[in-house]
UniProtKB/Swiss-Prot annotation:
This is Serine protease 52. Its main location: membrane. Residues 56-287 form the Peptidase S1 domain. It is found in: Membrane. It comes from Mus musculus.
């Protein structure tokens, strides 16, 4: 009997270490940015939890520590579109950014809010995946994945954004859009070097569909009651991020900047790809490429707790047998 128990212990140890390693790999939780106290110590713009200090057209300069998932996608050294970090291997963006482009000259910049920073870090793109049903006229299924040639070194200014299959816009609050797109529509072609951010509200699909007849169910819209605040040219592919109403500490990507009728016009909200409709496609595509990505399913239990629960159940089974 003692020998059998020793044998079970020998079998248990590697399994426990394997599960512990799996849980430890999730320690860098998506959507959790630097706390306001730590940010002040680093002489960055102070934030209140869930409320960026920055207020794109009508926006204000943002610090990368407020939106550490935001990246710039470059083509031949020029800013092309925005994107967001899903994990150390993957960047999420919009398909329309890459019309008739290949990945040979694509790079991303990350970890900075200033495009003019000396010694800026570039990361080469290895593969580009456009949605197979992308419609370049309607801009339906306007979503793309970029696989990097080497993994990102995640840190306080390079943090993955969370995604979720929750589609109900009522579940979200405190939504923001970021980008290096134009800030003044009268100065076309002039883009800022400093990242901009603007707060927006999510609007009901039926109301948006009445105003914008080309809206599909794969899109959502967001804007403000004040004209002059919106995403614009150059912001495409960037993330529309929100907090859950019951959890203001974690940020989720709800939309991808896609299209609009002008920028910041009254009663004409911006249109975004609805990310919740594509989390399973993202999961399947990344798995096929050999670099799987896990999204948060519509569950009350976080993934890290699930790991702990597995460990606990395994120990209980061990003690009872």
């Amino acid at each position: 009997m003692k020998r059998w128990k020793d044998r079970r212990t020998g079998l248990l140890l590697p399994l426990v270490l394997l599960l512990f390693g799996a849980c430890s790999s999730l320690a860098w939780v998506c959507g959790r940015r630097m706390s306001s106290r730590s940010q002040q110590l680093n002489n960055a713009s102070a934030i209140v939890e869930g409320k960026p200090a920055s207020a794109i057209v009508g926006g204000k300069p943002a610090n990368i520590l407020e939106f550490p998932w935001h990246v710039g996608i470059m083509n031949h050294g020029s800013h092309l579109c925005g994107g967001s970090i899903l994990n150390e291997w993957w960047v999420l963006s919009a398909s329309h950014c890459f019309d008739q482009l290949n990945n040979s000259k694509l790079e991303i910049i990350h970890g900075t809010e200033d495009l003019s920073t000396k010694g800026i870090k570039y990361q080469k793109v290895d593969k580009l995946f456009l949605h197979p049903k992308f419609d370049d006229w309607l801009l339906d299924n306007d979503i793309a994945l970029l696989l990097l040639k080497s993994p990102l070194n995640l840190s306080v200014n390079r943090i993955p954004i969370c995604t979720s299959e929750i589609s109900d816009i009522q579940a979200w609050r405190n939504c923001w859009v970021t980008g290096w797109g134009i800030t003044n529509t009268s100065e076309k072609g002039v883009q800022p070097t400093i990242l901009q951010a603007v707060k927006v509200d999510l609007y009901r699909w039926d109301w948006c569909g009445y105003i914008l007849s080309l809206l599909t169910k794969n899109m959502l819209c967001a804007g403000t009651q004040d004209p002059g605040k919106d995403a614009c040219q150059g912001d495409s592919g960037g993330a529309l991020v929100c907090n859950k109403k019951r959890n203001t500490a974690i940020w989720y990507q709800v939309g991808i900047v896609s299209w609009g009728m002008g920028c910041g016009k009254k009663n004409l909200p911006g249109v975004y790809t609805k990310v919740s409709h594509y989390v399973r496609w993202i999961s399947k595509q990344t798995a096929k490429a050999g670099r799987p990505y896990m999204y948060e399913q519509n569950s009350a239990c976080p993934l890290v707790l699930s790991c702990r629960a597995i460990l606990f159940l395994y120990f209980v089974m061990f003690l009872l047998t």
